[in-house]
A protein has these predicted regions:
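Low-complexity, Gly/Ser/Thr/Pro-rich intrinsically disordered linker/tail segments
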Residues: 66-103
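A charge-rich, low-complexity, intrinsically flexible signal that marks solvent-exposed coils, linkers
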Residues: 6-21, 90, 103
Length: 103
């Protein structure tokens, strides 16, 4: 029960924990955008607006969670790779970020 109330509407605790972890690290807007991108990657027609509202939550809860979690990890890794490429001073953190993305 350590997850904020905001993420308790995600039925799968592993996915909720992952989204929460990403939101702590990169901010909730980016974490929510990556979830929405992952939903799109798994075939769901969802708007990428960074809002974890009822439409996104419903899409999350009806998704194949194994596929969605894999897609979310991939999206997070892509985010971190882009961040390291565009901000070279942060590239030293890439290895740790990728471990976090795929955890």
């Amino acid at each position: 029960d350590a997850l904020p109330i905001f993420y308790k509407d995600i039925k799968d605790v592993n996915l909720a924990t992952k989204v929460f972890d990403l939101s702590v690290n990169m901010g909730s807007n980016w974490a929510h955008r990556l979830v929405q991108r992952a939903l799109r990657a798994t075939g769901q027609d969802i708007l990428e607006d960074g809002i974890l509202g009822p439409i996104t939550l419903a899409a999350i809860n009806k998704a194949d969670l194994t596929d969605l979690l894999a897609a979310l990890k991939s999206e997070a890794a892509g985010y971190y790779r882009t961040l390291a490429a565009t901000k070279p001073k942060r590239a030293k953190f890439l290895k740790g970020w990728l471990k976090r993305a795929y955890a």
